[in-house]
Structure formats: C-alpha cells, structure tokens
Regions:
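Conserved beta-sheet core of the metallophosphoesterase superfamily
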Residues: 90, 96-185
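C-terminal accessory extensions appended to soluble enzyme cores
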Residues: 19, 171-201
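Active-site glycine-centered loops adjacent to acidic/histidine catalytic or metal-binding residues
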Residues: 3, 47, 94, 124-125
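Active-site glycine-rich loop that binds ribose-phosphate moieties when present
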Residues: 67, 73-79, 99-108
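A general structural motif
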Residues: 39-41, 87-88, 117-118
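Core catalytic region of metal-dependent phosphoesterases/phosphodiesterases
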Residues: 1-73
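Core dinuclear metal-dependent hydrolase active-site scaffold
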Residues: 78-98
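Short acidic-hydrophobic surface loop/beta-edge motif
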Residues: 76-85, 133-139
Length: 201
C-alpha cells in the first residue's frame, strides 16, 4: 500500500537527520521481509514517500522493490478474482489527503473513488485502520461496497503530535471472503495486542 521506506530528504524539515536507517538498509530490509511472501504479492502501490524520492531524485524505490519481488507496481490498480463464479474486483491505491476525523476520512475515500467500480477498495495513506461498507441497489438486489483503511506501523509523535492529530495506534487489517462472498474483517491494534511495544501512552 506504499510508504515502504522512510525516504527522508533535506527538503522535508529535519527528517534526514532523524532517520534511523539508511535508504540502502531500508531497501534490503523491505525486500528481505517480503521475499517469503512474494508468490502472494501481485502488486505494489507507490506511496507519497516513494513519490517524493522519485520527484526529487528520479529514484523509483517501488520499481526496485517490485523487480526484486517479481510483481507489478504503480500508483493504483484493480485486481479481480472469482469466488464461486462471482467476480470480486479490488481497487487499491495508497491514497492522498489527511483528516482529523474518521467520518471525514470515510467521505473523502468514497468521493475519491466514486468513478471506480469495484467490490473492495483499499487505501493506506492516512494511517487509519478501519473497514466500512455501503449497500448499493442493483437490478440483482442489494450489493455491497467495502472500504478499508489498511493501517500503518508509524508510532505517534513528531509531526502528528505537533499538529494535534488523533493518536492512531499501529495496526493492520485482515480481510476475509467466505464461499457466500461475505466480506469480513479483523483489526489488530498494537495497544490491544502488544501494548508494551507502543511508543506513546
């Protein structure tokens, strides 16, 4: 979902001086982390961190990682698969913009994808971790669209703290689809699963 590396630059406040890993080390770490799962990875999204380096230095981190994992990459994609002959389309993009409130983040997500037809929409930019659904009337009866913010692993502090943004604990989302094409989700929050690892109280 993007932002796989810190990609600090001297043009972005003091990020270059606060980075804890070199970009080379980050690339090695990301590639080695995902290699055991490479057969299940079909696409990598560019995030705003990767796009920053591409813009400033003409360095495409996502391409380097995708080539190492032998998968496609880009800004956004729609992937499809079948569950009992029903086609499920999944739209994914890193996303853009920020919001202090979950309800304004949800409305922006819907608005930004209104011209895209899919069953499941995935977005990661705003660091939230949640899933919501909207019933859609069709000639075949009610269908559902599922929207998911996929979470993040960035601790609270620095920019978030100075802007008084809400604390969004590190989290990830597990989506599942059963044989009857029912989409369910489970969220794993660090403050509920491993509170001792949190960087703030």
């Amino acid at each position: 979902m993007g932002d796989l590396a810190e990609s600090a630059t001297k043009q972005l406040a003091n990020s270059a001086f606060k980075a804890t890993m070199s970009l080379d080390d980050q690339l090695d770490y990301v590639i080695n982390f995902f290699k055991p799962f490479k057969d299940d990875i079909v696409y990598l999204c560019k995030g705003n961190h990767e796009l920053r380096l591409e813009k400033d230095y003409d360095l495409d981190l996502t391409r380097i990682i995708a080539n190492a994992l032998n998968c496609d990459y880009g800004n956004q994609t729609i992937d499809s698969f079948k569950v009992n002959d029903e086609i499920i389309d999944i739209y994914l993009a890193h996303g853009r913009g920020s919001s202090k409130h979950h309800y304004t983040a949800e409305s922006a997500f819907i608005r930004n994808t209104q011209a895209i037809n899919a069953t499941i929409y995935l977005n990661g930019h705003n660091h939230r971790c949640q899933c919501f659904t909207i019933p859609i009337r069709t000639h075949d009866g009610l269908k559902r669209r599922y929207y998911a913010f996929t979470g993040a692993f960035l601790g609270y502090g620095g920019y978030s703290d100075s802007m008084q943004l809400p604390i969004l604990p590190e989290a990830f989302l597990h989506l599942s689809i059963d044989k009857d094409v029912r989409v369910d989700h489970k969220i794993f929050y660090i403050d509920q699963r491993a509170k001792e690892l949190m960087k703030t109280n």
